[in-house]
Amino acid sequence: MSQIVVGPLLRFVSDTEATLFVETDGECEVEILGRTEPTFRIEGHHYALVRLEGLEPDSRYEYEVALDGERRWPEPGSELPPSVIRTLDGDGPLQICFGSCRVALPHEPPYTESKDTDEDGFEVDALRMLARRMVEGDAREWPDQLFLLGDQIYVDEAAPETRERIRQRRGTDTPPGEEVADFEEYTWLYAESWREPVIRWLFSTVSLSMLWDDHDMSDDWNISVAWLEEIRRQSWWHRRAEAGIVSYWIYQHLGNLSPKELDENDVYRQVRGNQRADEPLFEWAREINATGAGTRWSFYRDFGRTRAIFIDSRAGRVLEEDRRAIVDDEEWDWIVQHAHGDFDHLLIATTVPFLLSPAFHHLEAWNEEMCDGALGSVAARASEKLRCAVDFDHWAAFQESFGKLRDLLSEVAEGKLGSAPGSVVVLSGDVHHAYLCEVGFRSDGKHRSPVYQAVCSPYRNPLDRKERRVVRAGFTGTLTAFARTLAKLAGAPDPEIRWRLLDGPCFDNQVATLEFEGRSATMRLEKTVPGREDDGALEQSFERRLV
């Protein structure tokens, strides 16, 4: 009889609908709450996205998962609470947890020790501690949503069991060595990353939204045209890239879509229930890898009176000799179309921060001008190498896109695109530290809703002491003044906004929580403590009322 390999993952949830994802070890029919869905098959792996419709708003449904009529979830002997689906209440309070960057490592010494005291230390997983608190706590205090904003897996730092399986399967003497090479190895990494019982329970009970970042595909993915040209010369890259696209679509993106969007998705229509789905899915992935076209990865979710727009900040980049952009014009038009007011709160989720520390913003803007030839071709080539070496790949390094998002935020906050919301918050991860900034626009006499940049990273992958010193320097006046001068001399445009650090930077394994009630909003950051895994091991770093 078939067994569950990955999942169940609770994905899209509205007031009357929900979708749940499972991977199984054989072809079967998956049943949840009386709804059934046949699996589809990709290179010997079997998947289903079960759709539940006609649910009651503001309701709680305990559920089990059956494969061909045999119960497979919860697992026999599990002491975890029942998995539940909680449909939305359009007018009620909303709690969203978010963050990014989570390595898959054992939860035992030395891996749970501080990185400063043990080279193998990655400290304690913040999501694991969140789940354990939920298990022991009041269900009325559980988060409604969990945003995973990039680097859900690390293909270039494969988890221990995946690395060992790679050694046994093909060896590591030739590229890409211990990194993931194809779809089969991607499936191992997802399974190892999401298989721990308490994480499985968390993902089965809190609705998940996901965006990919570079480590889901490759370190520095799509940082520049020079990087892209170099990686495409590697014999192993195209197979990796196609596998990365297919695996992301299956494990992460598919569940971001509503039932209506699934009905309209041409690729899903070809794959659903198909026992030979490899051909259409990999053909589609080859087209995307070759041309960069073929899909829009950005999406949006409405949670009652709060709208969240999730911007794909990696796959859809424009990388040309004379132009750089985070997304192309067509996708940007889609973002503008959906980023209107008329909500109590507007969230813009983008894996890479819109606003960095002021010094590093100016350094990235300077670097882009240098790459574009501000001081000639020799300096441009050196600047491209610097861009990759120090990860200058955020919105500040794509000034065209930075300016567009800045202006969009201003227009929404002014009420030019519908009624002004109570708050506008940009949510990001990627940078392995957390902070909260308030955005200041030019003094023009116009009233604007408060606008914030909220960053939370990592769930589990902390910086070492040296890296932390570099990050802190970016918030100092001395380095900011120096970097601003460099950027100005190179011809970089002024950002035309200023931002004030309210809280942080914080360098722990951590999880952020946004709480909304009516037009009020609060942000809280909580951290884990190296070596400590008791049920009270999440400690508050800061809490701030946003509006």
Language model features by range: what are they?
Residues 1-547:
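Metal-dependent phosphoester/phosphodiester hydrolase catalytic core
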